[in-house]
C-alpha cells in the first residue's frame, strides 16, 4: 500500500473507529499509510463530535472514487458489507486488506480482497478466508478451515480444524465452531454458542441465555 495516495475508511460507526486504530497500528509498524479520510452517510459530524480529526470526504451513497483511492471496510454487518461493496465497486473502488501487526498468519493461508484481521487473530495452515471477511480481536481459524465472503467473526471466536463457514455468516463473541462442522450461508451464531452440529443456511443458533437464580 505504500504507493497509494489515500487510504479511505468506509464507515464511521463502532467497527469503523476500531479499524482506524488498527490501520494506525499497521502504519506505526511500517506496513502502510495511516487513514487519510472516511466515508459515512451520517455526514462530517460522525467522528468530529467524538474528537477525531480524520476528515470526512463524503457519503457512501454518493462518493465517486478518485485515482489512488484504496478503501478499508469498516462495517461489521455481513449484509451491510455486501451492500456497500456492491455500490462502491460499481464505481471502480478497490479494497485493501488490513492485517494487524499482531495477527499470526501462516504462510499457507489464503486471504481475499478487503479482509480485516484484527489484533491477536490467527490462522492455521491451509486456512481460506474469502473476500471481505471481518475477523475481530482474539479470533482464530484452525487448520483447513474456511470462511466465505462477507462473513463476520466477533471477538474471541474459535473456528476449529476443517470447519466450513459459508458466506454472509455472523458469529457472536466467544462462540466455538467445532471441527468438521459446516455453517450455511447467511446463518447467525449467537454469542457463547458451542456449535457441534452443522447449521443450515439462513438459520440462527444460540446458547441458552444466563438465568437469574436469586434476587436480593
How would you label these PLM feature ranges?
Residues 77-131, 135-145, 157-159, 163, ...:
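Left-handed beta-helix
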Residues 4-23:
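Glycine-rich adenosine-cofactor-binding loop
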Residues 12, 40-41, 100, 208:
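Cofactor-binding loop segments of dinucleotide-utilizing enzymes, especially the Rossmann-like FAD-
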Residues 12, 137, 149, 154-216:
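Glycine-rich hexapeptide-repeat left-handed beta-helix
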Residues 43-104:
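Phosphate-bearing ligand-interacting subdomains
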Residues 26-48:
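NAD(P)-binding Rossmann-fold cofactor-contacting core
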Residues 9-10, 39, 74:
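Short hydrophobic segments within beta-strands
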Residues 23-27, 88:
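Active-site catalytic pocket residues across diverse enzymes, especially alpha/beta-hydrolases
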Amino acid at each position: 500500500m505504500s504507493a497509494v495516495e489515500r487510504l479511505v475508511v468506509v464507515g464511521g460507526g463502532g467497527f469503523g473507529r476500531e479499524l482506524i486504530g488498527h490501520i494506525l497500528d499497521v502504519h506505526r509498524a511500517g506496513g502502510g499509510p495511516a487513514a487519510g479520510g472516511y466515508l459515512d452517510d451520517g455526514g462530517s459530524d460522525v467522528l468530529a463530535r467524538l474528537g477525531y480529526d480524520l476528515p470526512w470526504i463524503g457519503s457512501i451513497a454518493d462518493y465517486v472514487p478518485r485515482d489512488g483511492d484504496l478503501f478499508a471496510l469498516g462495517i461489521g454487518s455481513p449484509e451491510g458489507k455486501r451492500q456497500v461493496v456492491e455500490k462502491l465497486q460499481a464505481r471502480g473502488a478497490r479494497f485493501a486488506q488490513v492485517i494487524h501487526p499482531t495477527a499470526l498468519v501462516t504462510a499457507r493461508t489464503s486471504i481475499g480482497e478487503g479482509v480485516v484481521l484484527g489484533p491477536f487473530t490467527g490462522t492455521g495452515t491451509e486456512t481460506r478466508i474469502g473476500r471481505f471477511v471481518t475477523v475481530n480481536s482474539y479470533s482464530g481459524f484452525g487448520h483447513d478451515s474456511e470462511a466465505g465472503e462477507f462473513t463476520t467473526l466477533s471477538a474471541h471466536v474459535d473456528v476449529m480444524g476443517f470447519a466450513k463457514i459459508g458466506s454472509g455468516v455472523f458469529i457472536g463473541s466467544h462462540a466455538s465452531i467445532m471441527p468438521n462442522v459446516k455453517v450455511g450461508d447467511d446463518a447467525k451464531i449467537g454469542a457463547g454458542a458451542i456449535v457441534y452440529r452443522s447449521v443450515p443456511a439462513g438459520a440462527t443458533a444460540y446458547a441458552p441465555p444466563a438465568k437469574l437464580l436469586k434476587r436480593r
